[in-house]
């Protein structure tokens, strides 16, 4: 199985959880240092791992990565599309980052992976969206819009790929905290914002990456064989 954006945070947690279940895993990310650290963690979890640097906004590089991962894994049955450029600013650059990384990298990754998953007899695509795609996103308009597009595309893909025995589902995490992540930074540099988010969650805390990862493993498993086209929020009731 492949996880794009798999060197830290939610992506790394997903790769680790799949490795614990015995899956051979491939991850990609832009930075070699984080990728090397992630490889060590996944191997410690007992997994076989292929890791390669890749700028997923580059169509050729993404295609090359998918092909190298399939060769290293000797096939493919699960793709987790987890890249995020987190386009924050409501300007040309913010929108372009969101479109190139959050949306088109997911689309192109799917195009590259689907023939291999079909060849394996079927499997699953799992896309990472966000609760920002389910509601208004005043602070980050591009991010909310592209994450909403991911949710819609999930439904379309589910219909397109059912006859290939490929299920397509989407995870919409809420505010998830991990070292080096957005909310870790906010906790240190914008405690007022961090506290407001923390107080908006009924459980009084932010989520952890492994709480998202466990759902991804379920959606990739035979236990979810009759689930497709769904978007599931993992937010501790943040949107209630």
Q: Which residues fall in each region the model found?
A:
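C-terminal substrate-recognition "lid" of short-chain dehydrogenase/reductases
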Residues: 205-234, 239
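A glycine/serine/threonine-rich, flexible loop-to-helix segment
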Residues: 163, 175-200
